[in-house]
Structure formats: C-alpha cells, structure tokens
Amino acid sequence: MNNKIIETLEFHKVRQKIEPYLLTEQGFEELRQLEPMVEVHRIQQAFDELTDIAQIFVENPYFSLAATSDIGPAMRRLELDTDLNIAELLAVKKVLEVSKSLLDFYGNLENVSLSQQLDKLFEKIELFPHLQGSLQSINDAGFVEDFASEKLARIRRKIREAEDQVRQVMQDILKTKGDMLSDSILASRNGRNVLPVKNTYRNKIAGVVHDISASGSTVYIEPRAVVTLNEEISHLRAEERHELNRILQELSDMLRPHGGVIRNNAWLIGHIDFVRAKHLFARDHQAVVPKLSEKQDIALLNVRHPLIAKPVPNDLYFGSQLTAIVITGPNTGGKTIMLKTLGLTHLMAQSGLPILADKGSRVAIFKEIFADIGDEQSIEQSLSTFSSHMTHTVEILRAADQDSLILFDELGAGTDPQEGASLAMAILDDLRLRGIKTMATTHYPELKAYGIETSGIENASMEFDSNSLRPTYKFMQGVPGRSNAFEIARRLGLSDIIIQSAQSWTDTDSDVNRIIEKLESQTVESRQRLDKIRDVEQENYKMNRALRKLYDELNRERENELNKARLEAKEIVDMALAESEDILKNLHAAASLKPHQIIEAKAELKKLAPEVVDLSKNKVLKKAKIKREAKVGDDIIVTAYGQRGTLTNQLKDGRWEAQVGLIKMTLAKDEFELVKAEKAEQPKKRQVHTVKRANVRGPKARLDLRGKRYEEAMMELDEFIDQALLNNLAQVDIVHGIGTGVIREGVTKYLRRNKQIKEFGYAPQNAGGSGCTIVTFK
C-alpha cells in the first residue's frame, strides 16, 4: 500500500486513538509498525484474534496484564556476552512474571471457545521458574536483597554493625561536648559522619577537618575515634559493590542461554496486549469486525468516520456489479467525508482493525487505494489547481488495476465546466471499462445523466434539509444531487419576481429537479422504515443474548444442584447400607435367616444405591482444587525467613524445591505460603515487613528501629502497626534501643495517640528492658 494514501486519509490519527489502551512497550512498537495488509489469510487471522478476545471479555470483563518495557536491547547485550544492569534485569523479571500470569489466566479459562489463533499465542509462552526465582533477589524498587548471596548478607551485616558503632560514638560526643557544637544534629561531608564544631573549639576535638561553613563559624570534623570505623565502612562498601557486580554477572549468565525464548515471550505479551487494545477501542467506539469479500462486494452498515467527534452514520452499498459511485450536488454537504470514510474504513480493515460500522458489514481487499482529494497545487512547479489535479490523476490511471480502489474529489474541477464535465465522464468511463472500483464527487450536473444512463455507474448525493437550510450529512445512494439555490434564496428574502425570472432560465431542468426531489423524499421514507427495522433487530439480538446467558446460568445452576443432590443421596444410601449391614449381622448371629436369604437381602438393599457420581470432570471442583494446591512456577514466601522465591520442582516424597535468590532450598508443604497473584494494572508495593496472619495465641511480630533516622523510624512504625492490625495480630514487639531516647520517645507518643492500642510497656530485663516496647492491641 502506498504511503501517500496513508497520509492523505490520516491513518496515523487512527493509530493514535488506540495508543491509550496499550500497556506494554512491545504493544506500542507493533502499533507503530501497523500498516494495511493485502493477504487475505493475515487479515482474517487478525479478525479471528479479535473475535477470540471478545469471547474472553464476555467471561472476564476486566482482563488485563501488567505493563512491560522493551527488553530488546537487553537481549542483544546478552548475545554480545555483556552483563545486564539492575534496570534491565528488572525488565526481564517483569516479562517472566507477566508470562506466568498470562499462562495461569489461560489455564483457568472456562466457558470460552477460542479459535486456534489466540490459543497458539498463549501456548507458545514458555515459563522459567528457576530464572524467576533467582530474579526475586532484586525487588521491584531495584534493590538487591541480602539473601541474594551469603557473602552479601555477611558484608551488609558488618556494615550495619560498624555504622551502629559510629553512631554510638558520635552520640556520646554530642552528649559530653554539646556546648562546643553549633548544632545538635550529626552532619555528613564527603560520605563521612562529621560533627558541626564551633570554630573557637576546633582544637578541642581531635579529628579530620572535612569542611568549613561559608561564614567560617562552623568546622565539620570527623572525630579521630570514628576515623578507623569509617575507613572500615568504606572498605566494606567497596566489597559490597564488588559482590553486587558478581551477582549481576551470575544472573546475566543464567539468562544468556534463554535470551531468544524470553524475547519471544515479550513479543507474545506485546501482541496479546495489542489485540486487547484493539478490542477496547472497538468496545468504546461501537466498532465491529467486518466480513471479508474477495469479490469486491462492499456493504457498510451505519458506517462512521473514525476521526470525527460526532459522525453521522450512513449506509453504503458498493456491490460487485458496480464500478463507480458518483456523488453529485453542492459543496459543504459531506461529499468529501464519504470519500474519506470509504477509504479509511478499508485501510483500518486491511490493517486488522475493527471498523466503525454495524454488525454484518462487508469490506473488500484492495492491493492499492489511490486518492486525489483536496487542493494539492504545486507552487514550486507553478502548476494551477487543474494542472495539479490532472497530473495526479494521470499517475493514478497509470498505476491502478482491478485490485485498486480510486477516490476522486471534485473530478474535472478547476477548468471550463463543460470541458471539465466531459473529462470527468471520459475518465470514469475508462475506469468502468477496466473494472476498477471508483468513487467520485462532482458538482457538474452533466454527470447525473451519465450516472443514470451508464450501466455499472450509480448516482448518489448528500441530503439537504430545506426547512433549516442546513445539510444533514445523510448519504442518499441512488439519488442524484439537486441544487437548492432557489429555495435558499427565497428563505433568505430574495423577491419572488427575481426567483421566478431565474427559474424561467432553467425550465429545461425543472422537471429533472422535481423527479430528484421526489426520489429524495422516497429515499428518506425508506431509510426511516429501515431504521425502525434495524431497531427491532437490535432489540431482538439483545433479547436473544440475554436469554442465552440466562439459559446457560440456569443450566449451570441445575448441574450444580443435581451434583449436590446426588452427593446427598449417596450419603443417605451409604448410611442406610451401613445400618442394614449391622441389622443383617445381628440377624445372622441370631440364625433367624439362612445365608442365601441374607445375601439376597443385601443385594436388594444395594439396588437402592445410585451409581457413583463421577465428579472428576466437574469444572468448579477442578478449579477449586487447583487453587488449593501448589504447582511449579508459583511464587512463595518462606515462612521461616520471610523471603520470597519460586517453586521449581516437586520431589517424590511430597517436598518442594524452590529457588530463593541464588540459593536453592528444599521445603516441606508447611514451610512456605503461596503468594496471591497481584492485579495486573497495579504495581507491586514493596513491603518493609512481612507480617503473618495470627490469632491471639499466634506468633509475635517484631520491628527493629535501631540505627534508623527519626523520620524513617516513624514511617516504618506507622506501616508496621497498620500491617499488624490488618493481619489481626494480638501483640507485637518494637525494638528501639536506648541511645539518646529520641526514637523511644517518638514510639511512646505514637502509641499513645493510636486508639487501637490496648496497652504498651517496656519488655522484661531479659527480653530487652527499656530498649524494647511490647504493644497489645484491643
């Protein structure tokens, strides 16, 4: 398809209307590359995908998926044996997570019958539970967790201990030499903890000067007592960076062999996102999937222009027996809009997009669409309007064939009316003989007679309301346009004498205008009747859908009730059989019956039992069972450590292998909890503390605020208390240490204000004493 028609009909604006519905970068890329297709099977494949996604939305109206970014550059870096950074690893992690969520969604689909097209997309997605588990060591904020490796955990523990010592030393100096300081708050310079010392006391505190204030009144000194500790922290930070780089390299090496498959997963996710976006566009714009006609038999029902805010719907029939439709009549009535609507509708359909029309519409497939629309006069070439249009027309006539659609706006305009009309008829006749479908607009009256007298050519016009003197923009197929100049002039106040005089000059055309006026009236009446019929059909269609849905629901309820009744009946019969067995034993013991009589009696009783109900195929029970059982690829929380991982394999003894960061663990069923799937469009929130649901007798939760800044500690305390209340905890411990008492005082004030707190107090001496507060909830 030539690029000129895409620009002329503003197809790029249609793409822009679909953009807001996309969630993935790959989906955006597919939309950017979207162009009309000419292969029937490719267009039909796109339409089948739209039909399938519509079926999914009937049962799952909120179907969505999480946003993903472009991992193409990251995969190319892996191919070049380069390691990925944290942002790139996070992007890959998100692709793996969305892959799993889509496969889980597909596996749980019920009451949906899909064609092979969408089935294939879901089935081509591959899972990598080991990789997914390893990437859990990087949280969604881009922080590499301590459990990524034992060495990293050890280094960070040492850093925290050293920093605690530094803070303790600094706090001691603040207490003992506070009068020498210009501020009671610790400062930081060049990455070192320093004291803001008054310049007059700079020699009283031994240490390294790192900075002086602008006024010179304050000197920032790193006390000698913490220099060694700070040096140790710097060394540990360097070790931490080295270990982080090693972890990133290890994760990159794990991903490298699977780069191609992961890239394909990203494409599949993006394509499903693109199909979903097309469906949402169709839903919001009342668009439909049209039928394809290989015989160029076009039928557009209530078709609308997609770029107009409040378009007027029109019917357009361009059957295989027609080669041209000529829209005659005055300007400003919407003739050009009809041209563009026909062209743009076919560009959309051949791009696999739904069209703004009613169900039952048909479109043709054209290898090329040409258009000469608007004033394309070339100033550089010093061409007149007529020359410019004719140059373009010549190019179109040379390039067009039977698989083309041609759109002419004001064919033959810009020159002598008689010659222009003759040229227009000659051009249309040439295209008619060559069997090339054409729609043309014109204001030449000569073309009305040409349309009536020539086979394969049909007249059309745009309706004009003579009462309001405004165009209605209604397309009237089969009715040539007529002039409304006399009627407009009369309503605007021109004298009847002048109008009658003018009419006397055009008596030869008056009969034709009266016939056209009558045809217009009949067409309007027919259209109104057709609209009423369509309204009734639409109501019937809605009623049928509602009845079908109700019928399906009743069938499901009936099946559920029958299964319930069978189970109850089986329980009753089992109880009866058990009781009868006891009775028969007693009778046999009493020798009141002969053995063969007992056997016969038991046989008769067993006849009362119904056949065993096979519930293995019950979809509801199967789905419930799936929800209760863990499976490979599920995200978990290791209860002993509160760390997140992924199940990778189930062992024969019932235990599970799980990947937690870079560590593989073997866990029993009661040593982990399944993580519930998060909603697709909501980003995962990082939880600072994992609090398990507990009752009054359950385990306690503990929050450690030691070493935190006051603001950070208060934020974590607030979040921790909220989580404890949400999880029904009865009691929690808050470790704040003794230190300067600032955080301890802040904790006390917070707890006093919280109405959900029943009581709180310091822990016993053997459990932390005044450095720990025990909180009991109401």
UniProtKB/Swiss-Prot annotation:
Q: Which GO terms describe its molecular function?
A: ATP binding; ATP hydrolysis activity; ATP-dependent DNA damage sensor activity; endonuclease activity; mismatched DNA binding; ribosomal large subunit binding; rRNA binding
By sequence similarity, the record places it as follows: Belongs to the DNA mismatch repair MutS family. MutS2 subfamily.
E.C. number(s) listed in UniProt: 3.1.-.-, 3.6.4.-
* Native source species: Streptococcus suis (strain 05ZYH33)
A Pfam family reported for this protein in Swiss-Prot or TrEMBL? MutS_V
Annotated ATP binding lies at: G329, P330, N331, T332, G333, G334, K335, T336
A Gene Ontology biological process noted in the UniProt record is:
mismatch repair
Function text? Endonuclease that is involved in the suppression of homologous recombination and thus may have a key role in the control of bacterial genetic diversity.
Instruction: Reply yes or no: does the keyword Transmembrane helix apply.
Output: no
Q: What is this protein called?
A: Endonuclease MutS2
Q: What is the lineage of its organism?
A: Bacteria, Bacillati, Bacillota, Bacilli, Lactobacillales
